[in-house]
């Protein structure tokens, strides 16, 4: 791997093939308390396929994998204490793909232990697509996250 970063985002270059278009390159969230959110995401992201990390205690923390990267920063002090709402303009939720139902179930068992909260326990959501199996949970700021498995 080269020591340069890609695109000025602070994320390291990837050796994985990157399609020229499509997909999501990165997600960047602002959080109320970066020190509180770091341990949650440090436990979560490797389990979701983002094993690389860029977190030396600075103003941002990031994780990356073959599918892109996920970043956190301290929210601007003008918005201190603001709460997340999936119904406001902006982000509704972030959903990650699971390899299996077992991965969904395991995360659901463990998410509270690293500072998250289960919003909806694992179950099938046939109203979405057949076989859609997911858990919905929140990070320490209440940002809605999802882990979903859909059989091939």
Give short role names for the model-derived ranges.
Residues 2-38, 94, 151-152:
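N-terminal beta-strand motif that seeds the catalytic metal site of vicinal oxygen chelate
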Residues 11-13, 17-18, 61, 65-106:
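Long, continuous compositionally biased terminal/linker segments
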Residues 28-76:
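Core segments of cupin and vicinal oxygen chelate
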Residues 31-36, 94-140:
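Vicinal oxygen chelate
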Residues 126-127, 150-152:
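A short acidic/small-residue loop/turn micro-motif
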């Amino acid at each position: 791997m080269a020591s340069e970063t890609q695109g000025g985002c602070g994320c390291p270059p990837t050796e994985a093939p990157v399609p020229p278009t499509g997909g999501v390159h990165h997600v960047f969230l602002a959080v109320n308390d970066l020190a509180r959110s770091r341990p949650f995401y440090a436990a979560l992201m490797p389990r979701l396929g983002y094993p690389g990390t860029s977190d030396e205690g600075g103003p941002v923390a990031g994780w990356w994998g073959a599918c892109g990267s996920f970043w956190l920063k301290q929210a601007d002090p003008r918005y201190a204490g603001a709460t997340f709402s999936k119904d406001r303009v902006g982000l509704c939720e972030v959903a990650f793909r699971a390899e299996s139902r077992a991965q969904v179930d395991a995360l659901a068992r463990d998410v509270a232990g690293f500072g998250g909260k289960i919003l909806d326990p694992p179950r099938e959501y046939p109203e979405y697509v057949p076989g859609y199996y997911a858990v919905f949970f929140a990070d320490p700021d209440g940002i809605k996250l999802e882990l979903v498995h859909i059989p091939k």
